[in-house]
């Protein structure tokens, strides 16, 4: 099981979208299945997973962007609703990951 770490951006967005129970369910799931999401091509291993929210299934839910470090940490970078934006460009995700890894 991975340790889950979240950025301030992710925390703020999750608080607006999920109930505490939905948040807890996601964190438990991603900690135990860190490779569940698809690797975003060209992002150096950043992953995207679809997750439902109240009143919407996965298709109408959110996309969570994260990556797994070699230290068995899962970093939750950001999240967005599909109706907000389709995708985040891979080069932006790569920059975020590099900033966290130093």
What are these regions (language model features)?
Residues 1-21:
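Arg/Lys-rich, positively charged N-terminal/basic patches that mediate binding to nucleic acids
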Residues 67-102:
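Enriched for short, Lys/Arg-rich terminal
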Residues 3, 47, 86:
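Residues that recognize and position ribonucleotide moieties
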Residues 20-36, 84-90, 95:
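Short, charge- and proline-biased low-complexity linear segments
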Residues 28-58:
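A short, surface-exposed loop/turn module that caps and links secondary-structure elements
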Residues 8, 50, 80:
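Anionic group-transfer/hydrolysis microenvironments
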Residues 53-55, 66-69:
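Short, low-complexity Ser/Thr-rich regulatory SLiMs
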Residues 59-64:
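Short, surface-exposed coil-to-beta transition loops
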């Amino acid at each position: 099981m991975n340790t889950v770490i979240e950025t301030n951006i992710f925390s703020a967005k999750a608080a607006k979208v999920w109930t505490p129970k939905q948040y807890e369910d996601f964190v438990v799931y991603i900690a135990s299945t860190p490779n569940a999401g698809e690797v975003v091509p060209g992002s150096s291993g950043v992953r995207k997973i679809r997750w439902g929210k109240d009143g919407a299934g996965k298709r109408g839910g959110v996309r969570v962007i994260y990556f797994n470090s070699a230290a068995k940490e899962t970093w939750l970078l950001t999240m967005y609703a599909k109706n907000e934006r389709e995708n985040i460009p891979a080069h932006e995700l790569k920059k975020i990951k590099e900033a966290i890894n130093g």
